[in-house]
């Protein structure tokens, strides 16, 4: 699950990808070639998203993920400030990657004649939140509060940078098991944040808001709050609240686990059917349930250090 998320760095149609080791950098690049900066390791995964290799940055032995995508498989393009045309996810990652540790960082990228190569940080040891919940069940509220606060901060950071993630879910959140820090990953469904309505969506349907299911229209901020409500329910109950479109449209929340009344109130507020009735990020952070949040290192010491991480996938 973890690698499948790190791998999803562009919208691609399924097709075989060229061998990263066999291709050469496009001529005219001023920076040192990829091959001299990074030691390319084994193939981690491949598919419609491209191919991803493990790697090491030669200068400091930093673990990295090396992503190779073919240009003719990229469906969503953007433009850097200097006018360079790149996959939209490069644009989004460059906007959010500096000065904040709660999102996965794009360390570098290279353009080849027929493809792009993206260099991403590869934290160790980590586990994505989906696998964490699958293995351990519903989270204690103290742990869920710490995790949810960090995700909220990451989403706020993205919005402050003008980026809408559009696929907030447990599979797209990495947990650093040593430090208790979370990272938001996979901006492949993302877009530039705007105040006007969106009429396209390529995220995960069971995390999408009822206004998208019914009308194929939504506003970015209120849709993000809905997804956060689904995520919080998933944390404290061990699974998502809705599986089918009709359940999303009804919006009736039933709690399968014993959950405090304050936590239930926050979840139901985030999952208000009318977008205008949902809380703002500030209102979420000021909610009574969100007080006395553990620091990441406290979270690691209390809840994580006794755990043995499974192998990365």
Swiss-Prot record:
Expressed primarily in cells of the hematopoietic and germline lineages. Isoform 1 and isoform 2 are both expressed in prostate cancer cell lines. It is an enzyme of class 2 (transferase). Changing residue 81 to S: Abolished kinase activity. Residues 38-290 form the Protein kinase domain. The modification Phosphothreonine is found at residue 23. Induction: By interferon-gamma (IFNG). Strongly induced in leukocytes by the JAK/STAT pathway in response to cytokines. Induced by different cellular stresses, heat shock and cytotoxic agents. InterPro entries: Kinase-like_dom_sf, PIM1/2/3, PIM_Ser/Thr_kinase, Prot_kinase_dom, Protein_kinase_ATP_BS, Ser/Thr_kinase_AS. ATP binds at residues 44-52, 67, 121, 128. One of its GO terms (molecular function) is protein serine kinase activity. GO terms for cellular component: cytoplasm; cytosol; nucleolus; nucleoplasm; nucleus; plasma membrane. The modification Phosphoserine is found at residues 8, 98, 261. One of its GO terms (biological process) is positive regulation of protein serine/threonine kinase activity. It catalyses: L-seryl-[protein] + ATP = O-phospho-L-seryl-[protein] + ADP + H(+); L-threonyl-[protein] + ATP = O-phospho-L-threonyl-[protein] + ADP + H(+). Autophosphorylated on both serine/threonine and tyrosine residues. Phosphorylated. Interaction with PPP2CA promotes dephosphorylation. The keyword Ribonucleoprotein does not apply. Disulfide bonds: none annotated. Keywords: Apoptosis, ATP-binding, Cell cycle, Cell membrane, Cytoplasm, Host-virus interaction, Kinase, Magnesium, Membrane, Metal-binding, Nucleotide-binding, Nucleus, Phosphoprotein, Proto-oncogene, Serine/threonine-protein kinase, Transferase, Ubl conjugation. Its EC number is 2.7.11.1. It comes from the Eukaryota. Changing residue 193 to F: Decreased kinase activity. Pfam families: Pkinase. Its cofactor is Mg(2+). The active site is at residue 167. Proto-oncogene with serine/threonine kinase activity involved in cell survival and cell proliferation and thus providing a selective advantage in tumorigenesis. Exerts its oncogenic activity through: the regulation of MYC transcriptional activity, the regulation of cell cycle progression and by phosphorylation and inhibition of proapoptotic proteins (BAD, MAP3K5, FOXO3). Phosphorylation of MYC leads to an increase of MYC protein stability and thereby an increase of transcriptional activity. Interacts with RP9. Interacts with HSP90AA1, this interaction stabilizes PIM1 protein levels. Interacts (ubiquitinated form) with HSP70 and promotes its proteasomal degradation. (Microbial infection) Interacts with Epstein-Barr virus EBNA6; this interaction upregulates and stabilizes PIM1 and induces cell proliferation by inhibiting the growth suppressive properties of p21. This is Serine/threonine-protein kinase pim-1. It comes from Homo sapiens (Human). The lineage of its organism: Eukaryota, Metazoa, Chordata, Craniata, Vertebrata.
